[in-house]
Amino acid sequence: MAEFATIARPYAKALFGLAQEKNQIESWLGGLEKLAAVVQEGKVASLIDRPETNASEKADILIDLVGLKDKELKNFVIVLAGQKRLSILPEVYAQYQDLTLSFNHIKSAVIYSAYPLTDKQVGELAQMLNKRFDSELKISVEIEPELIGGIKVEVGDQVLDLSVQGKLSALYTTMTN
């Protein structure tokens, strides 16, 4: 996926810049989200990979499936189709979303937990993490039973590992060195 990230970055930045000019950042985020979801569906993915279907047909099908009304977003899909890059739409969406959060001075955080967290626990964690990372955070929670217990938090390239698995790994490293 690192290759997709590298390819998608200039597209996401260009689209975000245009969205800023047109004052359409949030509305285009929704359109990109729909496009990213549709492209990941099996039948649509196979259509995109089909060499006998020309680029304009692929773009038209995607535009119709999502129901895009915005001229610039339609043009964006047509450009991606013409360059055989429709498959990077999910990564373009992810990077555009990161740019939107950054623009709004919000960081994205993922809390990995061995067990489901209650809303109260997530709220308390959010308060602590906002202070620790000195930023407003948009938090999502994912369940990872292999953590055994505790949590692991990722904010950008920073990782805060308070899991049992992390502590056992640290102990193992200490004992073997």
From Swiss-Prot:
GO terms for molecular function: proton-transporting ATP synthase activity, rotational mechanism. It comes from the Bacteria. This is ATP synthase subunit delta. PANTHER family: ATP SYNTHASE DELTA CHAIN. Pfam families: OSCP. F(1)F(0) ATP synthase produces ATP from ADP in the presence of a proton or sodium gradient. F-type ATPases consist of two structural domains, F(1) containing the extramembraneous catalytic core and F(0) containing the membrane proton channel, linked together by a central stalk and a peripheral stalk. During catalysis, ATP synthesis in the catalytic domain of F(1) is coupled via a rotary mechanism of the central stalk subunits to proton translocation. SUPFAM superfamilies: N-terminal domain of the delta subunit of the F1F0-ATP synthase (SSF47928). It is found in: Cell inner membrane. Its main location: membrane. Keywords: ATP synthesis, Cell inner membrane, Cell membrane, CF(1), Hydrogen ion transport, Ion transport, Membrane, Transport. Belongs to the ATPase delta chain family. It comes from Neisseria gonorrhoeae (strain ATCC 700825 / FA 1090). F-type ATPases have 2 components, F(1) - the catalytic core - and F(0) - the membrane proton channel. F(1) has five subunits: alpha(3), beta(3), gamma(1), delta(1), epsilon(1). F(0) has three main subunits: a(1), b(2) and c(10-14). The alpha and beta chains form an alternating ring which encloses part of the gamma chain. F(1) is attached to F(0) by a central stalk formed by the gamma and epsilon chains, while a peripheral stalk is formed by the delta and b chains. It is a peripheral membrane protein. One of its GO terms (cellular component) is plasma membrane.
